[in-house]
Amino acid sequence: MKVIQEKLPASQVGLEIEVPADVTQKAYDDTVRKLARTVNLPGFRKGKVPKQILIQRLGPNRIKASVLEDLIDDSLKAAIAQENIEALGNFQLKSSFDDLISAYKPGEASSFKAAVDVPATVTLNSYKGLSFKAEKSEYDPADLDEFLTQKQRELATLVPVEDRAAQMGDVAIADYEGRYVNDAGEEEEDIIPGTQAEDFSLDLEEGKFIPGFVDGFVGMKPEETKKFTVTFPEDYGNEEMAGKQVSFTVTLKELKSRELPELDDEFASEATNEEFETLAAWQESLEAQLKENAEISTKNSVRRYLLEQLAANNSTELPEVSVNEEITAVLTQQMMEFSRMGIDVNRIFTKDMIPKLRETARPEAEQRLSNSLILTEIAKVEKIEIDTDKFNERLEEAKAELQEGFDEERLQEAIKEELTIDATLDWLEEQSEIEFVPAGTLEAEEAEAANGEE
């Protein structure tokens, strides 16, 4: 069998296959015999239809189409084996099937073109001695104080306020309704859907609801009704309301202040369900946790910007079949996260939405797959090995989590890949020159750049 290979983009190989004349004749004869045995035609017993009657009744094109379906599939498999091609997934027929039917003649050579996905290719250009910036998170004692204050607020007693006006930090119980303000500055008659509530509890704090809404309550007294206008942000989730002026009519029905519990051992015990008996022990644990969080945040930042450098300096060609598998993995992970949050995934992952969700997940899937392939290739080149004790420990943890119903061989491979990538990232960090900047610096620069592009 004559086969011409052509390298195609997206990790594909193009094949032009010429099927010998004797093979096309045999395929035709085999198909006609098969149809004669299986086709039901009026006036004939099954399996007893004469060849010419069969061709006449079914039509030559229908028979040739049936021949070509098997011929293309069999010839492609033979060509892949002959050329030692490591094909992934199904093939794509590049020739027009209708043209092949028209050109096909039993006993004459027949040619067609197809493409198959092959394993991804990785081109390593530069990965040692990378230079980049990353954000360094530092433990700030103020974070501990803020956490404890928030816990005090959560366990605070709400005390009715009657002798003063509302101020920031209070809790307002109110009725409200919103109406659009037209270009003439007049309030429209209809209430906007979703902007009406009764006995709504609102914390009078900065950042609650939309800008200006909380401020409108400051200075009000219980039983007072007031109108004020706010402008919804341009990036508000409801596009119909984004950037619009809305007049709110609010009635403050109750006003409450928070009476914070004392910051003492009793409070620590209550806030932690008796996990800690003393405030000092709880503070020590919280401090250690916050310090660990800062280290993890720093490490995540280093790896994020390291991966960006690897992606910029090295390249991959990804087969579509692998990308689709990774898209499925991304969506499966999202479904599990939503499920853990108590969200009904069936309302999000509907039949109509899945194609859109898959397209949205594609960039992340391609980046994840590319990163993994680059790191795996670096590990091979640099002969990076994983720690056996760490592998065994992680394997036992995974078995305990899964308990039963898992393929141990696949589990071992997954853990080995995970630890290899982790070890490779650690090795690359040691090889890199990293300039640390305060946390939030780079993200602020990126946000500013993104706004500039808009």
From Swiss-Prot:
The keyword Electron transport does not apply. Keywords: Cell cycle, Cell division, Chaperone, Cytoplasm, Isomerase, Rotamase. GO terms for molecular function: peptidyl-prolyl cis-trans isomerase activity; protein folding chaperone; ribosome binding. Its main location: cytoplasm. It comes from the Bacteria. It catalyses: [protein]-peptidylproline (omega=180) = [protein]-peptidylproline (omega=0). The keyword tRNA-binding does not apply. GO terms for biological process: 'de novo' cotranslational protein folding; cell division; chaperone-mediated protein folding; protein transport; protein unfolding. Its EC number is 5.2.1.8. GO terms for cellular component: cytoplasm. It is found in: Cytoplasm. Residues 169-261 form the PPIase FKBP-type domain. Gene3D superfamilies: 3.10.50.40, Trigger factor ribosome-binding domain (3.30.70.1050), Trigger factor, C-terminal domain (1.10.3120.10). Consists of 3 domains; the N-terminus binds the ribosome, the middle domain has PPIase activity, while the C-terminus has intrinsic chaperone activity on its own. Belongs to the FKBP-type PPIase family. Tig subfamily. Involved in protein export. Acts as a chaperone by maintaining the newly synthesized protein in an open conformation. Functions as a peptidyl-prolyl cis-trans isomerase. This is Trigger factor. The lineage of its organism: Bacteria, Bacillati, Cyanobacteriota, Cyanophyceae, Oscillatoriophycideae. The gene is tig.
